[in-house]
Amino acid sequence: MQGRSVSVVRIFSVFLFAVLVGFLPLGAWAETSITLKNTFIEKYKNRATITASFTVDKAHKKPNPASKDGDLHIAGRAPEVGLPIVAEIMNAASVPQAVARIHEAEGTDREISLAGAWRIWTEHGGDSEQIQGKKLAPFTTSNPDHVFEIHPVTKLDDLSVAETLKPIAGYKAKDAGPAFHRYEITKSQIIPGKTTTTLVTNMAGFNYVEFLLELSEAPHKVEDGYLAKAAVHDVDDGELVVRNRRMVFVEGSAPAQAVKDMKEGGCLHVLGIPRIDLALVSWRARNAKARPDALRWSLPYEIIVVGLYKDNACERI
C-alpha cells in the first residue's frame, strides 16, 4: 500500500509539472536553435558512432573526480561535424595513456582520429544558435557553448578505450523517474528546409541516468552497434516509467555484448545518457505536410547505453 501511495504522489507531481510547463510558450525558457544539414541527419540517424578528424583546442588538466562523473572534457573541432564539439572520455582516470595523448595534441592544430558515440543534447548549448558548417575559431575553454558531443569516446587513433563504457564508481546517477519525465516533457519545434533542418528546444540536462531496460523487440544490428526499442523501469521498485524508447548500443562495449543475443522481454540494469533521435527528426521533417502537428511534438530523444550493472535488479520488474 505504501509503494502504491508513493507511485500516486510521483505521478501526480509529474503531471502537475507538465501542466504548468504546458502553459508556457517555448520562448519562455532559454532556447537553443540547432541547424543541421539534411545529409548529416540521414547519414547518422541510424548509427551509434562517428569518427572525426579532431583538433584538440582545450582539455581539462585532469579527469573530473568520480563524484562529479569521472569524465575528461575535450573541446575541439572536426570537419565531419562542423559544430563546436566537446568530446568526453568516461572513467578517464582508468586510461592515463589516452589522457596523455589528448594533452600531447592539445593546442597543436594536429588532427587526431577520434571515435565515439555522437551525441546532440542541449545540456550546455546556452541561449544560442548552433549552425552546422559555420566557421569556428579555436576554443579557449574546455566547455564552450555546444550541443554536439562525442560522448563517450571509444577510440583515439589506434588506442581503444571502449572498456571505459561502464558504471562510474562513486558517482550518483539520476534516478529514472525524474530524468525520463524531464526528457518526455521537454518541448521542441522542428523547422524543415530544403537542405537543412532546424530544431529549437530548451535545456534538457539530466545527463547520466540509471534504469532497468526491458526490450520491446530483439536488437537490430547496425554498422557500428545495435538499436532496440525498450521500456524503462525504475531501479528501486521496478515501476514502469516510459514505454517503447529507442536504445543505442556501441559496438565493442559491454552493454552491446550483453544485448546482442537477447530477445523481446530481456532485461538489463544499465547506465545511459540521452541524445536527440535524428531518425525521429528526419521522420517528422519528411512528414511535415501530412502531419504538421508532429513538428511541435515533445523533444525526440533516445538513450545511449554506456554502462552495464551486473546484479539481479531486473527481478524487480
Where are the predicted features?
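Bacterial N-terminal signal peptides
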Residues: S13-P25
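Intrinsically disordered, low-complexity, compositionally biased regions/tails
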Residues: S7-V8, L26, I276
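Bacterial N-terminal signal peptides that target proteins for export
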Residues: Q2-L16
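Residue-level detector of intrinsically disordered, flexible termini
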Residues: S5, F17, G27-W29, K58
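OB-fold and OB-like single-stranded nucleic-acid-recognition modules
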Residues: A30-I317
